Amino acid sequence: GMYYSLWDRKVNADVKDKSLDATYNEYMIKQLNELIDIVQPYTHIVEFWFDGGWEKEHERWPAKEIYQTIKSREPECQIGINWTIGLPENPDAHPVLPENQKEGYPIRYFPSDFRLGDPYLPADNDPKLFSHDGKLYYMPWESTICISERWFYNTTDKKYKTVEELAGLYHQCTKNDNILILNCPPNREGKIRDADVTLLKELRKKITQ
């Protein structure tokens, strides 16, 4: 999977200047193609996770071009943009928490394959049908959780969730046909920490009993 911040604080720092959008959006599409070029010799990309879109109105982002660019090269790749859902009276309302999302609410960034709202978990009675241009689309919720405390590798990051806690989160996040991303940051050599591997094996045993 790939993480990409739509808002580049260096190249596109002045988000209020709409005259810069076209140039920046072209730059961004080229970057996405470059990332795919780098990864494809080694593996397929199964997910693109986009962030930072709330810094501009949704229509200023080339969501359709982003989607088509990725799908044309990685057809099975799933694509989501953080804080995917808006309000009927304001598609750019931010944030619309999962417990406040209702069937038929507008898809803020269309097209997308699933909903995001990091770091929140799905509501118990999570709706699935959301709207764009009068049509409804099925969109599960994806939760993003760290196996320890940090997203990125850090030598001081040694406080792990217990296998019982992870199993509970797994069931909570995947019921109702939803998705869980469990982050295990690789070290500086690109290897998963031994403690992560041990905990993942224990979790697998726990949830498959």
Segments predicted by a language model, with ranges:
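Mature catalytic domains of secreted/periplasmic carbohydrate-active enzymes
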Residues: G1-Q209
